[in-house]
């Protein structure tokens, strides 16, 4: 007996290795087809300001974009935003911006808003936003420089300049939330939806 009952693999509208690893480890077969969208432009035009709302919109837009090119397929979109108080962070453009973000986050608590949306034929079948709370320890400029030297260009791949599944874990005093939520794809609500659709045997 197999775990997955779908007629075709799930389509993941993301090139994130962390999200792909989460699905692989959960035994969910998938095909990764990234959505080519101007995420910042979509968020700006939307007029939304709440981090969770922006993440939800972008997850839905990614899934809908890929769904339009792959009719009949079940498409999963995901997005994550970082909020420090009322301020939302974007992925740093370069090392200097990553260092600036880390200096702002150091010694403070921020939130990660992770959203997923499941779409078929342009229709959203399921959507969820889950929050994780992260407490970064105080960091000196020297520690930030050492960290950025170690991680290299990957600092620009994630909002906040860190990847907690790697060396980024050294930056934290406290982490409150589901591991998959922190990595940008809340698995538990996704698995619950897939079970409700009779797509899983477990």
Curated annotation (Swiss-Prot):
GO CC, alphabetical: cytoplasm
Domain of life of the source: Bacteria
Reaction equations catalysed: a ribonucleoside 5'-triphosphate + H2O = a ribonucleoside 5'-phosphate + diphosphate + H(+); a 2'-deoxyribonucleoside 5'-triphosphate + H2O = a 2'-deoxyribonucleoside 5'-phosphate + diphosphate + H(+)
CDD domains named in the record: Maf (cd00555)
Active site: residue positions: 79
Keywords: Cytoplasm, Hydrolase, Nucleotide metabolism
HAMAP family: Maf (MF_00528)
This protein's name: Nucleoside triphosphate pyrophosphatase
């Amino acid at each position: 007996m197999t775990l997955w009952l779908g007629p075709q693999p799930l389509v993941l509208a993301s090139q994130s290795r962390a999200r792909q690893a989460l699905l692989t480890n959960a035994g969910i077969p998938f095909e990764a087809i990234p959505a080519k969208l101007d995420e910042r432009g979509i968020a700006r035009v939307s007029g939304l300001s709440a981090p969770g709302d922006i993440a939800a919109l972008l997850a839905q837009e990614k899934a809908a974009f890929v769904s339009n090119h792959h009719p009949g397929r079940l498409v999963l979109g995901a997005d994550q935003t970082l909020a420090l108080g009322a301020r939302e962070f974007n992925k740093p453009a370069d090392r200097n911006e990553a260092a600036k973000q880390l200096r702002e986050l150091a010694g403070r608590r921020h939130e990660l808003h992770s959203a997923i949306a499941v779409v078929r034929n342009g229709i959203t079948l399921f959507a969820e936003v889950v929050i994780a709370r992260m407490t970064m320890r105080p960091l000196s400029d020297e520690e930030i420089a050492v960290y950025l030297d170690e991680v290299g260009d990957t600092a620009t791949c994630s909002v906040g300049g860190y990847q907690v599944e790697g060396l980024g874990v050294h930056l934290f005093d406290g982490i409150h939330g589901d591991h998959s939520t922190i990595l940008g794809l809340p698995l538990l609500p996704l698995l619950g939806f897939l079970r409700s659709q009779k797509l899983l045997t477990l």
